């Protein structure tokens, strides 16, 4: 059956042919995978003067905005991969229904700078049980869970025209030799919807209008002790919704 979208429907559809997977390990909003270290971080630097008002990374509005941008595909089963120093490997998953492929060194690793090769033991690619369809003109940007700083693997970033191609088989760069055990539910990759558009761009010196726009923008933030940037965002959203 061919999936179709109504012209006014702005929906992303994820599906699987694996019975029960949507209940056991579903694709989720990326905001459900905010890393623990960020959650535990204080907004203010501890043991500083109360009036110093020195904030930490948690006060940076770009961080929570980034965490909410898309969707996360969690690993759907336990996985064990053993990579020997001579390049031999074997893998085992907790369910024989889940299959894995390998990108040989000649496909990726051997083309990297030396320092990057040192951090690449093997590239593993799952036969991902999830498929996705986006509205016309919308691609998905595949990203690693950057701020999770996973010591075992990193998924390679890239873009997929998911309005016409619905497979998402992630390329996992394993960092370590020996046995790597990755548990079911580990966030595998983040997917951010991006609209395919072409933009013109200009590089020039500042104009009076540029300076005025910057001063207005800066004052919206500087005129508040806290949440000036966030309040500017809310005002912009309200204006957008009224148009």
Role assignments for model-derived ranges:
Residues 1-165, 171-243:
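Non-catalytic terminal segments and appended small domains
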């Amino acid at each position: 059956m061919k999936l179709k979208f109504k012209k006014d429907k702005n929906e992303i559809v994820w599906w699987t042919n694996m019975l029960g997977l949507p209940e056991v390990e579903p694709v989720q909003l990326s905001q459900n995978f905010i890393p623990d270290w960020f959650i535990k971080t204080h907004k203010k630097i501890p043991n500083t003067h109360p009036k110093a008002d020195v904030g930490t990374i948690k006060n940076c509005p770009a961080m929570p905005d980034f965490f909410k941008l898309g969707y996360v595909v969690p690993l759907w089963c336990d996985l064990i991969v053993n990579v020997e120093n001579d390049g031999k490997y074997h893998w085992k998953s907790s369910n024989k229904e889940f299959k894995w492929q390998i990108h040989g060194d000649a496909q990726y690793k051997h083309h990297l700078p030396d320092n990057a090769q040192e951090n690449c033991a093997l590239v593993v690619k799952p036969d991902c049980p999830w498929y996705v369809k986006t509205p016309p003109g919308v691609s998905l940007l595949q990203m690693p869970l950057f701020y999770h700083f996973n010591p075992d693997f990193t998924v390679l970033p890239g873009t997929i025209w998911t309005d016409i191609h619905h497979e998402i088989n992630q390329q996992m760069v394993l960092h370590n030799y020996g046995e790597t055990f990755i548990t079911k539910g580990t966030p595998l990759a983040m997917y951010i919807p991006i609209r395919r558009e072409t933009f013109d761009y200009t590089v020039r010196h500042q104009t009076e209008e540029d300076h005025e726009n910057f001063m207005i923008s800066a004052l919206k933030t500087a005129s508040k002790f806290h949440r000036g940037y966030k309040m500017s965002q809310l005002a912009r959203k309200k204006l957008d919704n009224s148009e």
